[in-house]
């Protein structure tokens, strides 16, 4: 098994070297490192599409047909332990089958294999509308029913044989693997021990071995026996528990060696318990092995960025977290749903993403197009590992070298500095001490005059570029703002108080009373003046509307006129 994995690693490594030579030449990693952009060598891309189904039938109790009933008591005790483990699991499977009914609409003829699940219809959901979990359970149930006949045959065969491993291939090419617990141990050790050591001693040995196997069973299948859901299954645990090379048995010629290694490394093999037989103490697992397809000529690079220095100022280049490079394409990669192995990324779909044109040209080496932003806080990374050493912005950091913690500086004309085991050994950055790899080499690819693009806003709303100037302005105007605050605190204090409102009301009432008093006094004064001086009254005839002819009659006016005539 070890040699098999080593061959897979060698083949995958060779393919990766070829792809790296063809594709990674697009990305000038040396030039980007001088502005703090760190890009690794990259890994290949594989798409996990469909899967192959396999079934494993586990016989948990060995066939013990020893003379004089040796080991029978130990087997009974072992079965009682298994009942505690398997009865809840069987009840859950019975409940699932009661909730989901699968009907087959195809015609069953003699000699005609049963149709695949695509011919089956999920008919009735006892609790109402089918949820996604119920549909998934229905699929597993239908697949189990299709393989039920073959599984039943191999179960019957296992009860009649003393082999520890049996393999059956059904009509559609799917393999059913049967593993019998401790059968080789019973055949090779317990039976000979009866004649040599006696029945009692052999039975004790069998009891101890069964107890050990029970705890090994919990270790290998703890996640599967605890739920009927789909869980990752480690074939190495099965191989160790049943002393069989299950990896080679469970794979076919359609799965390449490098794919087998990636599947095992990332633990992508899923197992689900689909049947529990308490009469024979057998458990059936449905195992799904993903089929991987490698995308040729594609590498996914992991990218990161640290701050760098230009003329004493600290800047930061924004790059995608992962870069996908292809012969005619360079963009980002969304690996949210992907699994990373040592040599590849395994994704359910193509993870390629578009990135702005400026970022593409920046990654291709045109640093004048790199989107940069000025660093105004200490949250930006200051160092990173590369080629077994450390690349750091020593101007913005406190760096030491060696066990003596000797302070080191950086040329202000360089964006970053590279530290390795040869020129430093123990590296300290802002109090963090790092030991460089002894095999690491100097990652400086030559001093270059750095020219980067103008500072731009990397988000729709980004004020970080002017934050430093705004901070200085606020510091300069702090005294004036304090004075203005004091003035504003004084203004509005007198008319917003309760005492001020009461005072205003009292003043208005007093003014109103004074006005009323003045009017009354003037009226009385005028009246008293008219009553006290009657001679000064205006003659009545001056203002009367009576005709003056009346006065002529009463005052002798007509007599005077007659005398004149």
Curated annotation (Swiss-Prot):
Any Pfam family hit: Fusion_gly
Residue spans crossing the bilayer: 501-521
Subcellular location: Virion membrane; Host cell membrane
Annotated site, Cleavage, chain positions: 116-117
Region (Fusion peptide), start-end ranges: 117-141
Record keywords: Coiled coil, Disulfide bond, Fusion of virus membrane with host cell membrane, Fusion of virus membrane with host membrane, Glycoprotein, Host cell membrane, Host membrane, Membrane, Signal, Transmembrane, Transmembrane helix, Viral envelope protein, Viral penetration into host cytoplasm, Virion, Virus entry into host cell
Membrane-protein topology: Single-pass type I membrane protein; Single-pass membrane protein
Gene3D superfamilies, alphabetized: 1.10.287.2480, Head and neck region of the ectodomain of NDV fusion glycoprotein, Newcastle disease virus like domain
Maturation and modification: In natural infection, inactive F0 is matured into F1 and F2 outside the cell by one or more trypsin-like, arginine-specific endoprotease secreted by the bronchial epithelial cells. One identified protease that may be involved in this process is tryptase Clara. Unlike most paramyxoviruses, Sendai F0 processing occurs on the cell surface and induces a conformational change in the protein that unmasks the fusion peptide. F0 maturation is a primary determinant for organ tropism and pathogenicity.
Comment on protein domains: The cytoplasmic region mediates the interaction with HN and M proteins.
Family of this protein: Belongs to the paramyxoviruses fusion glycoprotein family.
Function (record text): Class I viral fusion protein. Under the current model, the protein has at least 3 conformational states: pre-fusion native state, pre-hairpin intermediate state, and post-fusion hairpin state. During viral and plasma cell membrane fusion, the heptad repeat (HR) regions assume a trimer-of-hairpins structure, positioning the fusion peptide in close proximity to the C-terminal region of the ectodomain. The formation of this structure appears to drive apposition and subsequent fusion of viral and plasma cell membranes.
UniProt name for this protein: Fusion glycoprotein F0
Biological source species: Sendai virus (strain Harris)
